[in-house]
């Protein structure tokens, strides 16, 4: 049997880290066994859908390198890949179940259902539908339908049955039918409920494996019951439920926690290296046997084993994510780095407006987390209005290094040449003349030329500051030192 997995987002917002992980694990599982990965859109919750939500999901998955074999953008034989195009189909199947006595019309009002729920909660019981409409006679049903009385369709749960499955991550899970309620499968607006549409789609798209969050464990027995009612072979789909992702406090990652960036778009916007995010997300609950951390997508596919997915909560460590991004920026080629800067919305205008901008950026390539930080570093280092710190002036005075600054200035002023190699030569001359080396040579030159005690490669930094600015800084600091 060919492995076919799916990720089925609702277009209700941006791609969340949790959704990205679900998509990635389904993608890796399919690719590890030469199978297909499908993205379908579950857009039946019309009130919550947002404009552009579908493209947003697909675009940010593509940014992470997760490209589906089938989707609304590349449809194949198993479409439609969007639920709103299948509403009549779902409705027909729900009505078929009514004809087969496996489901029934429910005419209960919202007020009655709310009253039943309130009563159950007061009695400390789990709210369950009281089956008021289960045994309505044919005459009553026909009368209600003729009067256009609003109805839903509910599945009749077999209370004597045990709904169980061998979870790919958690082992055997079993839930008695007596613990379930008769679920609504078709709403009063004729739109299929989530659990009903999902079962039909998974069956008709020949999905073989479903990896999803643990919040879906409670949906699984209902989906098994629906599949049985539709005469689907429930052994054909394997389910695996991922652990939750927790924040630094140990609480489940919540979209309401605004202090933590949880959407892939946040990281794209800040200019993180895309695969750094993919790599980080891959290790949220997966431990490769060889304990590799830095992995290409190809390596992930080769190493992926569903048996290595953890039941324990996965810790969302932003510091670890930043570490991954720094590693990737350090290891990518100069050409890849330059192309990234030229194309990203944060930096492409800066590239056009300053011909030295790319060279300035290259100074920080091996140290940055993202492009947002890179811009700050470039601005800080090459800020024309920067003032020298009193503590840096004191450093030069205390260590009696004024001569280093003066000799560097004298060597620079007598030459019109100004490039990286020339600056390196001057530094060598200063070393010979003053007999200083190491920090006693480089620190006073850095402070005097850049007005900063730290920074990237010195000769390049001086070069990109420009001769005029460097001379101005040297004159100003010599006045202070004298």
Swiss-Prot record:
GO molecular function: ATP binding; glutamate-tRNA ligase activity; tRNA binding; zinc ion binding
EC id: 6.1.1.17
Chain positions recorded as ATP binding sites: 255
Record flagged with keyword Aminoacyl-tRNA synthetase: yes
InterPro entries: aa-tRNA-synth_I_cd-bd, aa-tRNA-synth_I_codon-bd_sub2, aa-tRNA-synth_I_CS, aa_tRNA-synth_I_cd-bd_sf, Glu-tRNA-ligase_bac/mito, Glu/Gln-tRNA-synth, Glu/Gln-tRNA-synth_Ib_cat-dom, GluQ/Sye
Domain of life: Bacteria
Reaction catalysed by this enzyme: tRNA(Glu) + L-glutamate + ATP = L-glutamyl-tRNA(Glu) + AMP + diphosphate
Pfam family for this entry, one: Anticodon_2
Annotated motif 'HIGH' region, positions: 9-19
UniProt GO cellular component terms: cytosol
Subcellular location: Cytoplasm
Main localization of the protein described in the UniProt heading: cytoplasm
Chain span(s) of sequence motif 'KMSKS' region: 252-256
GO biological process: glutamyl-tRNA aminoacylation
Keyword set, alphabetical order: Aminoacyl-tRNA synthetase, ATP-binding, Cytoplasm, Ligase, Nucleotide-binding, Protein biosynthesis
Family of this protein: Belongs to the class-I aminoacyl-tRNA synthetase family. Glutamate--tRNA ligase type 1 subfamily.
Stated role: Catalyzes the attachment of glutamate to tRNA(Glu) in a two-step reaction: glutamate is first activated by ATP to form Glu-AMP and then transferred to the acceptor end of tRNA(Glu).
Subunit structure and binding partners: Monomer.
Protein name: Glutamate--tRNA ligase
Organism listed in the record: Ureaplasma parvum serovar 3 (strain ATCC 700970)
This protein's encoding gene: gltX
């Amino acid at each position: 049997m060919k492995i076919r997995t799916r990720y089925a987002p609702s277009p209700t917002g941006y791609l969340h880290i949790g959704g990205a992980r679900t998509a990635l694990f389904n993608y890796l599982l399919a690719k590890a066994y030469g199978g297909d990965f499908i993205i379908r859109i579950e857009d039946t919750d019309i009130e919550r859908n947002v404009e552009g939500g579908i493209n947003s999901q697909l675009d940010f998955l593509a940014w992470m390198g997760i490209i589906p074999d089938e989707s609304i953008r590349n449809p194949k034989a198993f479409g439609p890949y969007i639920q709103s195009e299948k509403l009549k189909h779902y409705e027909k199947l729900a009505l078929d179940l009514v004809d087969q006595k496996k489901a029934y019309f429910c005419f209960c009002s919202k007020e009655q259902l709310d009253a039943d729920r309130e009563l159950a909660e007061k009695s400390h019981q789990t709210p369950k539908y009281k089956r008021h409409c289960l045994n309505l006679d044919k005459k009553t049903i026909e009368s209600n339908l003729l009067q256009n009385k609003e109805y839903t369709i509910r599945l009749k749960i077999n209370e004597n049955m045990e709904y169980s499955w061998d979870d790919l991550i958690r082992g055997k899970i079993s839930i008695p039918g007596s613990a379930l309620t008769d679920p609504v499968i078709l709403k009063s607006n004729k739109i299929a409920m989530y659990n009903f549409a999902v079962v039909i789609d998974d069956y008709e798209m020949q999905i073989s494996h479903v990896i999803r969050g643990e919040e879906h464990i409670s949906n699984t027995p209902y989906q098994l019951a629906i599949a049985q009612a539709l005469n689907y072979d429930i052994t054909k789909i394997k389910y695996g439920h991922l652990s939750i992702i927790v924040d630094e406090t140990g609480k489940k990652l919540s979209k309401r926690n605004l202090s933590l960036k949880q959407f892939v778009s946040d990281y794209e916007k800040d200019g993180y290296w895309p695969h750094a995010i993919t790599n980080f997300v891959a290790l949220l609950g997966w431990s490769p046997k060889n304990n590799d951390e830095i992995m290409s997508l190809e390596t992930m596919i080769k190493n992926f084993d569903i048996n290595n997915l953890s039941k324990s909560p996965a810790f969302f460590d932003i510091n670890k994510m930043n570490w991954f991004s720094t590693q990737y920026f350090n290891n990518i080629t100069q050409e890849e780095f330059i192309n990234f800067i030229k194309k990203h919305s944060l930096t492409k205008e800066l590239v056009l407006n300053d011909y030295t901008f790319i060279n300035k950026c290259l100074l920080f390539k091996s140290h940055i987390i993202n492009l947002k930080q890179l811009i700050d570093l470039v601005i800080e280092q090459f800020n024309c209005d920067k003032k020298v710190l009193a503590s840096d002036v004191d450093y030069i005075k205390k260590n009696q290094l004024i001569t280093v600054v003066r000799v560097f200035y004298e060597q620079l002023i007598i030459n019109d040449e100004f490039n990286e190699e020339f600056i390196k030569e001057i530094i060598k001359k200063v070393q010979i003349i003053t007999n200083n080396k190491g920090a006693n040579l480089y620190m006073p030159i850095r402070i005097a030329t850049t007005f900063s005690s730290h920074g990237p490669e010195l000769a390049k930094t001086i070069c990109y500051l420009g001769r005029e600015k460097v001379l101005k800084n040297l004159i100003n600091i010599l006045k202070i030192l004298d």
